[in-house]
């Protein structure tokens, strides 16, 4: 006799999450393994959690790539790595004036957070000073929250960034520890965890997430979500692999839009009160179902990414408005 599979009550699990009961790894995995016909029910339950903590608000973030390419690390997914042959722009540090101009552009795009990103393994003290100079001017002229993503930091660098007014520091775990050697050999998973811990100790809000679609298993996707829970990351970017031509990961099979939705929902269930951001690869992987992603996530990037093109900000504003959601804005 064929065994009848018991249907999961996603709303019940969502209610329990709102009341403080943490989802189990088994139920988190069940989200990823659910039949595609259940995805709307899953997203509806995820929205219950999202709405409880964030209402109808959507946070917008904008990136500036202040130093592009020329990175000594061999991350297989990255077009800026030493092993990449991707035809990208390569340049040293932008001037402080250019970084400040980018902040004003972020405000015009209705972003509330401005992320200053630089390629490379780790910044020198001189480079940290360069960023600090720009941060101070931005803080004087806008209400933007400043996020930095500069690579590995030592304790003194983290402390100085905090003192300068850096609100958040991004350092993604990227994938599960068991899978890390398959994507990079020049540093370790533990190196990344160490930097997240350092910025937390300095009083900076930790931003850390993952890139999905790099050959990891569904179980490993669940494990990375729980590791981010353990690290208490305040902001969790969910990136979906863009297999850039010229990188070792060129030609990797893309995730389906429904797979991406399940990942976003799972991340919301595991980290109910955290900012979940649909990040790199949003347009390519989610495609026509991008709006549905915001029923689990409460944050997106506007404008371009590091080396790939995003959609027009006006399209993002319209998407948010059409959903009946509202943008969290800051002002000059």
From Swiss-Prot:
Record organism: Bacillus cytotoxicus (strain DSM 22905 / CIP 110041 / 391-98 / NVH 391-98)
Protein name: Biotin synthase
Catalytic activity: (4R,5S)-dethiobiotin + (sulfur carrier)-SH + 2 reduced [2Fe-2S]-[ferredoxin] + 2 S-adenosyl-L-methionine = (sulfur carrier)-H + biotin + 2 5'-deoxyadenosine + 2 L-methionine + 2 oxidized [2Fe-2S]-[ferredoxin]
Keyword Iron: yes
Gene Ontology MF: a single term: biotin synthase activity
CDD domains per UniProt: Radical_SAM (cd01335)
Enzyme class, UniProt record, top EC level: transferase
Keywords: 2Fe-2S, 4Fe-4S, Biotin biosynthesis, Iron, Iron-sulfur, Metal-binding, S-adenosyl-L-methionine, Transferase
